[in-house]
Amino acid sequence: GWILCYALPEQAAQQSYNFIEDYEISFMIVFIVLVTLLILYIVYENHTRNKELLKYAQTDALTGLYNKETTEQLTDELLSEDENKYHAFLILDVDCFKQINDIYGHAVGDIVLQKFGKLLKGTFREGDILGRIGGDEFGVIMKNIQTKDIAMKKAEELLAKTQAYKIDELKGNNISISIGISTAPQDGDCYMDLYKRADQALYQAKRSGKARVCNYFS
């Protein structure tokens, strides 16, 4: 039989191999980019999920405010960092809340707490600590204020806003709150000390007829 042989220049013979090498390089670049993007996506998703879990652990599910544990923790951290600065601790309690639950039902009671939580957010500064620390009890830490009078005026403002706040589910009836105030560092240098003093002031507000603000005096 016959055998045909072709003699090709070396450059022409290498062209197919060069094409394969270029293709492999392009493929590897695309592969590395895709893997990098996938890793970044996984890291981002994990970070977002961890933030959501942390927020869930720190907040009260009903109102979106801080829960009691986080309120206490943030307050203690603030007081330990800013020992020489003046802060006010307010305890707010919805007056006759048990009657609201008894008359309108617990579902309406939850709505009242939710809407009051929104009212708190709209009244105080973004940097202040707002928490739900009991069933119908809320705590507010007003950071870095000059005098107790500032806290008193803000509490009276909230008192007026609450009494004028319309909640449709209450069918024409409004809610009121009582407020007790203590201050740091005068009345204490930790959450529990400030809570106890503000709670005493709150008790005095309740005894004096509710729907009012009382300061703690040692």
Descriptions of predicted regions:
Residues 1-27:
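Extracellular/periplasmic juxtamembrane segments that couple receptor/chemosensory ectodomains to their
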Residues 9, 102, 141-146, 163, ...:
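Residue-level recognition of strand-loop junctions within catalytic nucleotide-signaling folds
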Residues 25-41:
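Selective detector of the "anchor" transmembrane alpha-helix that sits immediately C-terminal
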Residues 39, 46, 50-53:
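Heptad-repeat alpha-helical coiled-coil signal-transmission segments
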Residues 89, 138, 177-181:
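A structural signal for short, well-ordered beta-strand segments
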Residues 152-156, 170, 184-217:
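Catalytic-core segments of nucleotide cyclases and related cyclic-nucleotide turnover enzymes
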